[in-house]
């Protein structure tokens, strides 16, 4: 629905309500709940294994370990799954081993040390493990059904959550609008927009969540996300804090893939 269509509908509702009130009618609110089914049918699974992730970008955060940890927590409290408590797989190393000898992987030098941010050209002190494009070369591990079937057999054939995670510093410069308090000659306060050129720095988080059937090793569903956060260049925000902030935005969408949701609202009815 476009913004203009939504505005028209709201205007029509207000006109109808005004007309009903003028004619002596009245209206009242009733609660409404809209159920939303999960994106993936997981009725055949009772257990879930957040196995690990192929990671790239900055090495300031162990995104493999932290992503697995942050996804397990809401699954325990907001789903009916039995979450398997297992060591997180070093999936980047496994993907590298399975990629050995492939021309496209050997072209990377076999170690992913590119030393530059492919997204914006920023150079970081510690370099970059793998760029976002490099991670695609390692994604063939998710098509290795026998590998995932073996993992599934080890953990009683659960639903397996895996994928890739790319987390990297990011910067952008440009005009930004801020609100500023001003007072006129009579002392009256008002808020005025102020546009200024600012350098901003932050991080980009781009995970791809892949859901695999532990019984067959086949991929059931893939979901990609991308979030970024920017701060004033003068603000020193730790990488881990930014990572947590970005993951908080993604987790609700991740959970909606596996669990039913209910959207609550109200509806106006005429008597």
Write out the residue ranges for each language-model feature.
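Sec-dependent bacterial lipoprotein signal peptides
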Residues: 1-23
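Short alpha-helical segments and helix-capping/turn motifs at coil-helix boundaries
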Residues: 6-7, 33-35, 145-147
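A generic structural signal for short, solvent-exposed coil/turn residues
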Residues: 12-15, 40-42, 75, 197
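C-terminal/domain-edge helix-coil "capping" segments
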Residues: 23-46, 151-155, 167-271
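Short hydrophobic/aromatic-rich motifs at helix boundaries and adjacent loops
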Residues: 7-10, 40-45, 120-121
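N-terminal segment of the mature soluble domain
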Residues: 47-169, 214, 218, 222, ...
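Low-complexity, intrinsically disordered/propeptide-like segments
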Residues: 17-20, 43, 68
